[in-house]
Amino acid sequence: MENLVRGGRSSLGRCLAILFALVGQLQTWAVMPQEENLPAALQNYDPSGLIRFNTLDQAEKKREQLIRWIWSGGLPVDVQPTVDRDIDTAVFEEHLGGLDAQLAGRVDRLNASVSPYDYHQLMYFISPKVRTTNSRRLVILNSGHRANGAFQYGVDQTANRLLRDGFHVLMTDMPLVGFNSDNSVILPGANEETLFDARGTSGHNQMFAKLCPPMLPDGEVFRFFLEPFIQGVNYFRKTVSDAGDVSFVGLSGGGWAGHMIAAVDVRIQTSFPVAGSLPLYLRPYSPGSRGDAEQMYEPLFKEVDGDGDGIPETAAGVASWLEIYALGGLGPGRKQVQVLNFYDSCCFSTNVYLTYTAFLSELVRDLGEGEWTIYSDRSHRAHMISTQVLSEVIIPQLSGQK
């Protein structure tokens, strides 16, 4: 009898354990975005009003309009950064924490100055120790709004894998993030510096508050975010003998940067913006996706609700997000793969991308030059570049595999 009771209690305990596990799993599922139908308001959404070109010529005119809105004199493809060549490997214990120093043959520190504002950003141009067929190629990496300290969230393993495969790697940070500490600009005619007393998202919001009209011409503020990348590409093309293609991998705000720089600089052949943006009309339907000033700036990204259904469907700014996406993949031999984490813990999650992905892919394909596609990563629940994306998307695409 005692054995029966003991056995009964053991069985009851196992049953309760299973029951509690199932309840816990149900609770987890309840708070996760579900792979079900789109929200009712988004079903049958037509994104075509957010694209204002249907020929290559019209698309290139839109690209030129965007470039001239930011740089009135055109893209600064001849401007070089100042350079400290072959710096000490101690940088891997400081600004390049998370990267494997044993994979680097040389590191040059680049200082990009945005003129005439005396605003500076650092970048690190890393030459690989191993020489392969990739050693004429460059990949730019950006971590977005990362914390100070070592690179992480998959950016570190991406950099190390690329160096191991023989690529040159350009490590970059956004303004007022990571190793970029310059917090002042000198405006033309001003008697004193304009200061930003915050970093990260708050600092970026200050930049837009203090550097938009009437202080500077509209669009000029984006130079502080994008021009360093252009100078980095300029340096690569000047320095590396028989320089090859340039690619861009960015996470979060770095994904935002990847969309933007690929739209204006066609020298970026392949871009992988990871968890970087959604069109404005989708942000209310994806938790945490509102974004900071550079994500939402109305003169650029404005969308209007022309039919009164509460969901914008018409582009009204300089370039809509969908136009920027398309321009990032348009051009001979060019491609953009937008990576969105389905269960992202930060932003740009769920399946709302389905409202535009087929339309945009077909548009770029039908225009006849370039490619645009999307990859929904369901392998994790974090805000990161996953091992799956690195091994199944980035490396195969860079290797010419489909």
Language model features by range: what are they?
Residues 134-144:
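Short beta-strand element of the alpha/beta-hydrolase
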Residues 143-227:
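Cap/lid segment of the alpha/beta-hydrolase catalytic domain
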Residues 85-131:
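N-terminal cap/lid segment of alpha/beta-hydrolase-fold proteins
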Residues 348-351, 358-402:
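C-terminal catalytic histidine-bearing segment of alpha/beta-hydrolase fold enzymes
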